[in-house]
Curated annotation (Swiss-Prot):
Heterotetramer of two alpha and two beta subunits. Interacts with BrxC. ATP binds at residues 46, 53-55, 99, 102, 107. It catalyses: succinate + ATP + CoA = succinyl-CoA + ADP + phosphate; GTP + succinate + CoA = succinyl-CoA + GDP + phosphate. GO terms for molecular function: ATP binding; magnesium ion binding; succinate-CoA ligase (ADP-forming) activity; succinate-CoA ligase (GDP-forming) activity. Mg(2+) binds at residues 199, 213. Binds 1 Mg(2+) ion per subunit. Its EC number is 6.2.1.5. This is Succinate--CoA ligase [ADP-forming] subunit beta. Residues 9-244 form the ATP-grasp domain. Keywords: ATP-binding, Ligase, Magnesium, Metal-binding, Nucleotide-binding, Phosphoprotein, Tricarboxylic acid cycle. Substrate binds at residues 264, 321-323. PROSITE patterns: ATP_GRASP, SUCCINYL_COA_LIG_3. Succinyl-CoA synthetase functions in the citric acid cycle (TCA), coupling the hydrolysis of succinyl-CoA to the synthesis of either ATP or GTP and thus represents the only step of substrate-level phosphorylation in the TCA. The beta subunit provides nucleotide specificity of the enzyme and binds the substrate succinate, while the binding sites for coenzyme A and phosphate are found in the alpha subunit.
């Protein structure tokens, strides 16, 4: 689950992580009142959407008066902001963060991520702050410093200091930088984060080390024990199809293609998308119905896929282990009848009760194309759309 920047800073502040003073505003009038409450003559007006790249897209403004704060707030609120992370449709700005301006001397990058290779949290840092870390990794990977953290003892002070020295934090501020990293790590672990990115971390003219931006993502599987984080959820920033899918325990992620996919198992779902791409198609979604899908669940999955106007065909790829092929077949037939499906539909079944499943499909009288293998199914759906 993602949250807004201002919410992330609220979380970090509780862990002693230094962040600029700021307030959220939903109207231009609130923006002015927020600015008035800050002890600063320079203000930063920041669009709050669940996407990066806001600065380059014009979503961050520097205001030197209350009149400018109001003008920028009126300009941004209600505007659709398009960044490299939003896609071409962009996201509508519904709230702003009004912050005090900072005297920035140098920008850095600090991030905590889960490293699947080591099954540990890794602290990453770079003196190339303010730019995309992916860009730094591609062009100057030697500028990214890492520390692998032992989960038994957590991030140690010496590791934080080593990282601070490695990215050339001024010597007199290494202690503050280390304290910052230790607070960030504590927040990461206690709040079940999957990503914590501070870009940029800044050193200010008055000798402070603070997070100028904060991106926190949380493990959705752990939210049951993070009630306070759940309160930060902003459904307006989420895909309505993904919200609907979650009601039925379906794992759905919308993509940009035109071939809808319904698969059981995350690994098979990713392989299905790969093979569609291999044969020249473009998947419209990732959809994992899981191992305990019922006919009702399959029907809802179909409805969610078809709510995407870009979908021109559907590929159902099921390997029945726990899942029974006849249950899937019944769900496919029921869903096809309920929604009045007119798009090409290719179904590949394999595993438990596969013969019964194929029989149900063939005797349904519906226009369903059967596939003998995953490759066969991918080629057929690509040729039909």
């Amino acid at each position: 689950m993602n949250i807004h920047e201002y919410q992330g800073k609220e979380v970090l502040r509780k862990y002693g992580v230094s962040v600029p003073e700021g307030k959220v505003a939903f109207t231009a009038e609130e923006a002015v009142e927020s600015a008035k409450s800050l002890s600063s003559s320079v203000y930063v007006v920041k669009a709050q959407i669940h996407a990066g790249g806001r600065g380059k897209a014009g979503g961050v403004k520097i205001a030197k008066s209350l009149d400018e704060v109001k003008a920028y707030a009126e300009e941004l609120l209600g505007k659709t902001l398009v960044t490299h992370q939003t896609g071409p449709d962009g996201q509508v700005i519904k709230r702003l963060l009004i912050e005090e301006g900072c005297d920035i001397k140098k920008e850095y990058y600090i991030g905590l991520v889960l490293d699947r290779a080591t099954s540990r949290i890794v602290l990453m840092a770079s003196e190339e702050g303010g730019t995309e870390i992916e860009e730094v990794a591609e062009k100057t990977p030697e500028k990214i410093k890492k520390a692998v953290i032992d989960p038994a003892v957590g991030l140690q002070g010496y590791q934080a200091r080593e990282i601070a020295f490695a990215i050339n934090i001024p010597k007199e501020l290494v202690g503050k930088a280390a304290k910052f990293m230790l607070g960030l790590y504590k927040a990461f672990v206690e709040k079940d984060c999957s990503i914590a990115e501070i870009n940029p971390l800044v050193v200010t003219g008055d000798g402070n080390v603070m997070a100028l931006d904060a991106k926190l993502n949380f493990d959705s599987n752990a939210l049951y024990r993070q009630k306070d984080i759940m309160e930060y959820r902003d459904l307006d920033e989420e895909d309505p199809k993904e919200i609907e899918a979650s009601k039925y325990d379906l794992s759905y992620i919308s993509l940009d293609g035109n071939i809808g996919c319904m698969v059981n198992g995350a690994g098979l779902a990713m392989s299905t998308m790969d093979i569609i791409k291999h044969y020249g198609g473009e998947p419209a979604n990732f959809l994992d119905v899981g191992g305990g899908a019922t006919a009702e669940k399959v029907t809802e999955a179909f409805k969610i896929i078809l709510s995407d106007q870009n979908v021109k065909g559907i590929f159902v790829n099921i390997f029945g282990g726990i899942m029974k092929c006849d249950v899937i077949a019944e769900g496919v037939v029921e869903a096809t009848r309920q929604v009045g499906l007119t798009l090409p539909l290719v179904v590949r079944l394999e595993g438990t009760n596969v013969d019964l499943g194929k029989k149900i499909l063939s005797e349904s009288g519906l226009n369903i194309t059967s596939a003998e293998s995953m490759a066969d199914g991918a080629q057929k759906i690509v040729s039909l759309v």
